[in-house]
């Protein structure tokens, strides 16, 4: 464990300031992310250095299509998530934490990337933003060694820690799940507005940004809602790549797979205002 960044003491309780949940924790409590815990009146990052998944992937798998194409990237994942999406694609490591992990120091991660001849490190699989302290330490060291840092994220973080992190992040794929607060609240236990703010901050930074939306029948496949999503992205930069991904039943959601025709219609709508639109899981 390592002491967490971004928290404050409020009397006998601890308030976490990393993400918009602002968890208020008593001694022994763990945040909604399941990896930030109060012990001895301090907040600790319990997943620091804990790695559940290590792989070398094509950069396109993140997915990033317009950044170092046809390159291989060392990909690291930990455990936990600060959203509770019913359709989680990586629920074994994001929601159900009883899985084996191993310790990997920041130095070891950087050395492994160089050994694998990777041009950088991708922080992915689970939610890397709640791996914040390790992510920040490793990203700083990676930059010192000339490596790139890639973030694959739900974007659920407060502006101050995000801006500090972006100093060392070179590219981001952000999962913009829907364009209604109802979806985020009921399906993910989060807030859309907070994620939209993250998108804006990343777009204003030097990091390359791509966005992914998983299209789910009856939940976020309304074409008018899709137009809102496209308008939002286009208002920032019409060249931001958008990945529209096909849903398959997973975790707690058993809706049928998204019809391919829905994806094709969505692509047509998106291409009216965006330059780079891609389909996934087709």
Role assignments for model-derived ranges:
Residues 1-27, 217-282:
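Auxiliary Fe-S-binding modules of radical SAM enzymes
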Residues 85-89:
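The canonical Cys-X-X-Cys-His
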Residues 69, 102, 188-191, 259, ...:
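Short, conserved glycine- and acidic-residue-centered signature motifs
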Residues 1-16, 20-78, 90-95:
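N-terminal [4Fe-4S]-dependent radical SAM core
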Residues 5, 23, 30-33, 46, ...:
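Flexible, active-site-adjacent loop/turn segments at secondary-structure boundaries
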Residues 106-258:
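Conserved AdoMet/S-adenosylmethionine-binding subsite of the radical SAM
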Residues 80-83:
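Active-site beta-to-alpha loop of glycosyltransferases that engages the nucleotide-sugar donor
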Residues 93-103, 144:
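A short alpha->loop->secondary-structure connector
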